[in-house]
Amino acid sequence: MIETIILAGGRAERFGSNKLLAELNGRPMVLHTALRLQWDRRFRVTVVTCHDAVRKLCKENGIACIYSEECLKGLSGSIRAGVRELAEKGAEEICFCAGDQPFLTADTLAAFHKAWQASGKPMGSCLAGDDPTNPAIFSKDCYPALLSLEGDAGGRRILSARPEDCFFWPLPNPDEARDIDTPEQFLKEQPV
């Protein structure tokens, strides 16, 4: 079972409101990847958030949720909250996905995980073109580094500090890494 955290604690400043709740094709954005992965038995999904409405959506849809005010301290707060809880439950590795990347498929994430495992590296990141992007995965050896992150620093800080320890995997379809940060991007994704 692949332990997967969906990071859903952001402030969505460029969007103007909580984009994770914006309905994309009839479903709140945060639920697209969460439900797609949860329905696939290869994954155990946990959403990390500080938003009451996201927590309520998770509860209504049977998705595990870590509610933490630490998310208000930036991306690192969400990562720390998730790592602490899953490490206590014995997770050997954690895969991180973004709540605003609704196009990621379970098959892509499973293929990334399989290739990462075969690499023997302690951490891995997908590539969209030449750019590292979510999802990213970290073995338990990386938990101390993840727990030491501060502010809006995410796993990319660790990946860039230790590239020799990182497995980089080109996404077969880089469109799956698209995130939605602005209302204009959101409107482009709506059916006509």
Language-model segments: residues:
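Conserved alpha/beta core of the MobA/IspD/sugar-nucleotide pyrophosphorylase nucleotidyltransferase superfamily
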Residues: 1-4, 144, 148-192
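Conserved beta-strand segments of alpha/beta enzyme cores
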Residues: 20, 44, 64, 122, ...
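Conserved N-terminal catalytic core of the sugar/cofactor nucleotidyltransferase
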Residues: 31-93, 107
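Conserved beta-loop-beta/alpha segment of the NTase-like Rossmann-fold superfamily
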Residues: 72-144
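Conserved SAM-binding loop
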Residues: 22-23, 47, 67, 96, ...
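N-terminal glycine-rich phosphate-binding loop and ensuing alpha1 helix
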Residues: 1-52
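Short aromatic/basic micro-patch
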Residues: 23, 103, 137, 168, ...
